[in-house]
Every structure is written in structure tokens, then in C-alpha cells.
Amino acid sequence: GKNSIAQKDNPRGSILKTDLTRAYVSFIRSYIDLKKIRPKKFKVLVDVMYGSGDSFIAQILKGTSIRIEFMHNSINPSFGGIRPEPIEDNLYELKRRVKEEKFDLGIALDGDADRIAAVAPGGAFIHPQKILGLLALHLNQDRHWSGGIIKTIAGSTMMDKIASFLKVKLYETPVGFKY
């Protein structure tokens, strides 16, 4: 049978639950030039892979003319039978729809929305490392940020080359929950 564990009050303190969604969305929006993208009428297809990313993207881009359509955005504990990883092998449907339905961009997020991949208008896969490289170039060249680049040990050597090209320091970190 099942054993139950008695719940006792914590004599050392209490738990405070806080919804940080509004603060998070505001923080992310502060890094986006919304004036530039507000009038753009891009058509974007986002595959959230049955994860948590849909509400954040909608809130971040609220007030723009970007038309967002979501796929795989229902609750599905088995993630629709696919691993919720934004790798090319898992994005066949996104690639097909972006190409056939003439989306300007496809975006894929993993289950907890901390990894990203993209699909170009013709259906070509854009690797996450390329996205990070483009972002680093944009921040340095267009935004004139001069800080270093941080990458995980699992990342490609692309960021090493970009850091060298931009003449900025490269920091490498280990991966895993203990770091």
C-alpha cells in the first residue's frame, strides 16, 4: 500500500508564492526595440513543443503588428510523443508549415523555453548556435555592447570565433544542474 507522510508546519518560516511573469516580460521587453518592430507585419509560427513558452512570447510581442500563430501549445504530459528539444529532427512539421504557409519565420522552443531554434522562410533550419552568433554580432555591431561572450562547454566553437572576431573576452562555463 501507500504510506502517507504527515505534513507539519515549518516552524522556521513560511512560503511566499510570487508570480514573476509581469516582471520577466517587462525585463525581456526592455531589451527589444519595440518601436522598430511594432509596425512590422511579420507572420511567425511558434512551436512551443507542448511546453510553457507560448504565453511569454505573446506577452513580449503584445502591441506589435507581428502575427503569431502557435502550434503544439496544448497541455500534453507526453509532449505529443516527441522529445521537446528544438533540434532539426524534431521540427519536420514546423519546417513544412513555415514553407507551405509562407511564414516569415518559424521559432521552436523546448519544453521549459530555455532553448531555441528557428526556421527560415523557405523551411531551412537555423541552428541554435547560429542564433546565438547572430545575436552576439547584433549586440556588438548594432547596439555597441562591448562585453564578453559566455558559452557553455557543450557549445560549438562558433562563439570562440565570433569572440575573436569581435575582440571580446570569451567565458566558458560547465553545464548541468550543479553549476
How should each PLM-predicted stretch be described?
Residues G1-S26, A120-Y179:
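Proline/glycine-rich low-complexity loops and linkers
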Residues S55-Q59, G80-R83, I116-G122, M159-F165:
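Short acidic, glycine/serine/threonine-rich loops at helix termini
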Residues D104:
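Short acidic/polar active-site loop segments enriched in Thr and Asp
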